[in-house]
Amino acid sequence: FNINAILTGLLSVPLIIFYPYMKRYTHWPQLCLGLVFNWGVLIVSIEFFNEINLYFFLLYFACIFWTLAYDTIYAYQDREDDLENNIKSTAVLFGALGHKFVMTFYTIFFLIIGFLGYKSSGNLLSFATIFLFIFAMILYLNKWRLDSKNSSNYYFKFNNIIGLFCFFFLLIF
């Protein structure tokens, strides 16, 4: 066991404890979820390199934006109930601007993933692939209806495809 990896894991405990209460105090519980949910990337970096190298830090940062995107979509399912019960979320904060924020989060995520693919392979095809995927996501998400629980659930579940794409993308590039 790498003691530094274990200690890095323990550093996430305060975030894990505070996350369930974030909706009471901030409109950004999705950010806290992103910090917590992707912490394993930092642990892996420590385990294999005994440091958090730039590649893994950028991967962690990218995954935070991915979490912001998909969990904001998920939050739109509960937006009306959250408004009635004074519960905060990015869906409540963004309101009708949800498409723009979610697409911004996805774009940042994909650009960082594209950069990591390029740095790993030196292949500009990685950026071309990412730009095509961003374009496809823009077209695809334009059909997302912010006021529909079913639509939000559908686009939330689509993140399985995004995860699969990113896995193979990083594997190939």
In which residue ranges do the predicted regions lie?
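Extended hydrophobic alpha-helices typical of membrane-associated regions
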Residues: 115-173
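Solvent-exposed interhelical
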Residues: 64-112, 143-144, 150-156
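Alpha-helical transmembrane segments of multi-pass membrane proteins
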Residues: 16-20, 62-67, 74, 132-139
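Residue-level signal for inorganic ion chemistry
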Residues: 29, 78, 159
